[in-house]
Amino acid sequence: AAAGELAGELSDVSLGNQLMAQWCAKVAGLDDLLPPDHVQSALGTVAALNMAATAYGLVNGVTPTGDRFDAGHPGENDHAKHVFVGENLCAAMTFLYHGQSATGLEIAERIYTALALKTCAPWNQRCLIHADTGLPIWGDDYYSNLAIWALPMAAANQDIASFTAAGGMIDRMIEAAN
């Protein structure tokens, strides 16, 4: 079904970053917003569907049969069936925060491999990369990708307060640079 046909209806499309609010809560040091079993179920679905649909992170929208969701946009700039870099990084960190480090790190590595090694452009801030090729589709100056700097914080299972506190990783990095 095209996106317009879904208005007012439920969709069974699995969104790659359906737990964005969970990531925000973890970064802010807040309690989980959803029951742990719901979070684990959603992460399992994202790994089984969205991660399996590409070698370059997570496809943004995947049907229960594993097909990339076609939102009906012409050309390649259909965000639903490709990889949204910033959103994928947040999803990777959500896996990290919820005890699935191997999966979270693999998602982040897939994205970084596409950006830094495949396209040799690690500092370009791409928005959307192609799910089949890992090559850029859209966005050369997209700042949500700066979320990558929060990856060490998520890998350490820390919130922003503890990560930036005296003696924390940021403090240690600054001290080492001095």
Report the location of each language-model feature.
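Active-site core of glycosidic bond-cleaving carbohydrate-active enzymes
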Residues: A2-A176
